[in-house]
């Protein structure tokens, strides 16, 4: 083995040891979403509505106790990525913040005062990593099915899957790395939701029907 190859082998070994050392304990993360200050989305173009949000956990039962796996330098799972807040609550709070930032009001379903009802089936909220030779590729994913109903007659106005994905490269995967990609996936999901043509058309329909009542 020449000197250059030997150095590469040593560096790869050190990298593997470093990754392994960081992977032995559970990671605790606090994902969340805060609307960008001073910025509104296309949701603001819709007349203010009273909206009820329901989020149901439809994730794979084998993933419901965590939001990711930590791995050692050889790709073996060694610990869990645990969220301090239930993922359904994280998504509910994010949607609530986005609607309120765009002049809409969130109401409880049982109050029966909603102009529109938004039902979310959370399919996956996950952080993952792929180990390459000298870096780690971190990935966050949020998959959900959405349904928008008229709050008065429960008529379905939109139904579709939506996704938010975020990737970044790092040298080491500490707790902040997992939280970062989970936040990124949540941000991308909310961004996609608030700009989706079907979502906007459904809410505009509700606003028009409200004006006629």
Which residues does each predicted region cover?
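Bacterial N-terminal signal peptides that target proteins for export
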Residues: 1-10
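Bacterial N-terminal signal peptides
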Residues: 10-20
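A structural "domain/chain start" motif
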Residues: 22-89, 198-213
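Surface-exposed short loop/turn segments
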Residues: 23-38, 102-157, 167-169
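Generic short beta-strand segments
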Residues: 54-60, 121-127, 163-165
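Short secondary-structure boundary motifs at beta->alpha junctions and helix caps
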Residues: 72-86, 152-199
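Amphipathic alpha-helical segments
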Residues: 90-101
């Amino acid at each position: 083995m020449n000197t250059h190859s030997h150095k590469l082998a040593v560096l790869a070994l050190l990298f593997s040891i470093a990754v392994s050392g960081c992977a032995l304990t559970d990671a605790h993360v606090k994902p969340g979403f805060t609307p960008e200050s001073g910025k509104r989305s296309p949701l603001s173009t819709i007349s203010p509505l009273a909206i009820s949000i329901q989020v149901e956990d439809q994730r794979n039962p084998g993933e419901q106790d965590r939001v990711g796996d930590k791995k050692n330098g050889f790709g073996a799972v060694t610990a869990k990525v645990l969220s301090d807040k239930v993922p359904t609550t994280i998504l509910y709070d994010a949607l609530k913040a986005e609607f309120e930032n765009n002049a809409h009001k969130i109401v409880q379903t049982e109050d029966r005062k909603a102009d529109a009802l938004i039902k979310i089936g959370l399919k996956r909220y996950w952080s993952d990593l792929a180990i390459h030779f000298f870096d780690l590729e971190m990935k966050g994913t949020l998959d959900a099915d959405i349904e928008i109903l008229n709050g008065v007659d429960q008529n379905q106005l939109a139904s579709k899957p939506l996704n938010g994905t975020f990737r970044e490269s790092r040298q080491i995967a500490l707790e902040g790395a997992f939280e970062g990609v989970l936040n990124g996936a949540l941000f991308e999901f909310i961004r996609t939701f608030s700009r989706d043509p079907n979502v906007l058309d459904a809410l505009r329909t509700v606003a028009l029907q409200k004006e006629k009542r």
